[in-house]
Amino acid sequence: MPPASKWPKVLPPLTAEQRRISDDFMRLWHETLPHRYGAIEAFNHNFPVRHSPPGFRTTLEIGAGLGEHLHYEKLTPEQEENYYANEFRENMAAGIRERFPRVQTVVADCQQPLDFRAGFFDRIIAVHVLEHLPNLPAAIRECYRLVEKSRGRLLVVIPCEGSPPYTLARKISAERVYKKRYGGDYSWFYTREHINLPHEVLGELHPYFTVEARRFFPLPFLPFVFTNLCIGLSLVPRARPLAVE
């Protein structure tokens, strides 16, 4: 009998109060991060811009938050019109519509099939998203379906979750912001948010994409998860997926 799959990961249910805090804090953190932690935000968003395919027309950004990434883009009117910002939380999507009315805001779960034809997107961007997804393989399969196969790119930034630098950074940043606003224990929040480690994300990407470019931050000359905060990946879709066990 084959071993049971770990996907999708099952998270403990939230109380109504935890759900309220979760939605509120996610928006608060997205509002706070650009103003207090500019260096890491610059890496998060400049990496996808620098590795975008030349002459791209269509973009899907999954987990777009409040649209922070759009501040780093220099889009033509056509590229802006064909930029689809996908967000799961309606309270976050409302912020995208307000700030960036010329892009297309799509409220949907990126772990489910999205209403676009195969190969529609020249770029798919996922900045600090893949670590959050209980059904990560389904999201990656959908990204593979949607990306244009001859010149499209999947542009990803993930945290070095579990590394000493990242653990310390969370302690002095997100945890501090959380406790100032809500008090109490923070661990229930982050342990159900950052549920996929870098090796898990890379393992699920491998059957569908090859790595064209990789960069660690802030120490690219020490390219190891345990010495860094984030990893940027420019990924090329395989002509055919590898067999998935």
Task: Please tell me what each predicted stretch does.
Residues 58, 82, 153:
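Residues at the starts of beta-strands that form the adenosine-phosphate
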Residues 123-129:
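A short beta-strand submotif of the Rossmann-like class I SAM-dependent methyltransferase core
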Residues 38-56:
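Conserved alpha-helix/loop element of class I SAM-dependent methyltransferases that forms part
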Residues 5-17, 24-27, 31-35, 134-149, ...:
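S-adenosyl-L-methionine-dependent methyltransferase catalytic module, highlighting the catalytic core
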Residues 65-112:
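Class I SAM-dependent methyltransferase SAM/SAH-binding core
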Residues 56-65:
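Conserved class I S-adenosyl-L-methionine
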Residues 111-123:
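A short acidic, Gly/Pro-enriched loop at the edge of an enzyme's catalytic core
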